[in-house]
Amino acid sequence: MGQKNHFDVIVIGSGPGGEGAAMGLTKGGKNVAIIEKESSVGGGCTHWGTIPSKALRHAVSRIIEFNSNPLFCKNNSSIHATFSTILSHAKSVIDKQTRLRQGFYDRNQCTLIFGAAHFIDAHTVAVKKADGSIDTYSADKFVIATGSRPYHPKDVDFGHPRIYDSDSILNLEHDPRHIIIYGAGVIGCEYASIFRGLDVKTDLINTRDRLLSFLDNEVSDALSYHFWNSGVVIRNDETYDKVEGTSDGVIVHLKSGKKMRADCLLYANGRTGNTDKLNLESVGLQADSRGQLVVNANYQTQVEHIYAVGDVIGYPSLASAAYDQGRFVAQAIIHGQAAHLLTEDIPTGIYTIPEISSVGRTEQELTAAKVPYEVGRASFKHLARAQIAGKDIGSLKILFHRETKEILGIHCFGERAAEIIHIGQAIMEQKGEANTIEYFVNTTFNYPTMAEAFRVAALNGLNRLF
């Protein structure tokens, strides 16, 4: 094999995890190649996941804002848009993101190889190009960052024109008046917000007893109420018995005996790691039943020189976490170990309408652990900035230790929640006595701002102490 086909590290997949690893390794002086099976970089995050869904959400939330503001919708006039119409906005954002990320690799002289990779042996991969040709490449180390795809149960016909998953929904060409979303996880709830915001009748089937049960209960309840108030029908503790595609829609038969009918179905219940085409057996690796790889604290698989990051290793399955994992692996490969361990308190951003974000522990976790905590709350309806913007739905909640005043968890529901949370996260991550709720009382905030919610919540919480 020619020297030009040998690299220090080969990264498989150009999503956030692969990008983080490749950029860190290249800047560290390593000769790096990144292999991408699609025709452009960015991975599922850019093309089917985070970027398009958030671009859709933004467009829908602006339409809702316009239609609910009497300053704009005079004489009962309102804006109406369809899903297929606002998809064009999402596609323009995808194009911008793709060009931006392509530039990263070009500027850093990271070799880009387009094609589907699979292992031949422990240090060699074959890449099948779009024209059918196959090239082989070798490396000292590998980083698997192939991401995940929607889970397809065998008894659901995803070839039917009215049955979609969270990838294929972005190719929706007809404009449904009624949609059933099966699966009320993060993806299902985000799309429920989008479709209901477009005035599409939305039924959300939840296989659990509450929405997003990993959240603080109050936040989960707030989302449930907001969905109910906006007209989303939630069916908790339900599982399908049969999904029947018809000529003009779909019928979902539930095991409880209920039947539901709509113009189309979005199946959003679970994801599978993209490992089945990698020929992992040739290197002595085996994925679990969900296609995911097991890694150690350094993100090494059972084969020491092969690492894995991002959705392909499962939890937390966040683009932000995947990027950090990739950077961590780059440090581990370059220096033998990473200088800093990744923080365990990863913020969660859920882009429903309104947004949800949290970091740290929930009330139910603290109660179960018998931690003496107190709660500070700020309602957005009491903030001048929220009143000005007409975004007064939501609240911020700070959980802190009664005795040390250490911040233990922050939970936010409302406009810009995913941005607001980082102010609290920055203080939470301080060491020792620097992590204190009193910081927000002793700091001057710009006025009027949404960030002021931290001061209001801190005062509210401290006033509860005795």
From Swiss-Prot:
InterPro entries: Class-I_Pyr_Nuc-Dis_Oxidored (IPR050151), FAD/NAD-bd_sf (IPR036188), FAD/NAD-binding_dom (IPR023753), FAD/NAD-linked_Rdtase_dimer_sf (IPR016156), Pyr_nuc-diS_OxRdtase (IPR001100), Pyr_nucl-diS_OxRdtase_dimer (IPR004099), STH_gammaproteobact (IPR022962). Its cofactor is FAD. It comes from Vibrio cholerae serotype O1 (strain ATCC 39315 / El Tor Inaba N16961). The keyword Chaperone does not apply. Keywords: Cytoplasm, FAD, Flavoprotein, NAD, NADP, Oxidoreductase. Conversion of NADPH, generated by peripheral catabolic pathways, to NADH, which can enter the respiratory chain for energy generation. Binds 1 FAD per subunit. This is Soluble pyridine nucleotide transhydrogenase. Its EC number is 1.6.1.1. It catalyses: NAD(+) + NADPH = NADH + NADP(+). One of its GO terms (biological process) is 2-oxoglutarate metabolic process. Disulfide bonds: none annotated. GO terms for cellular component: cytosol. FAD binds at residues 36-45.
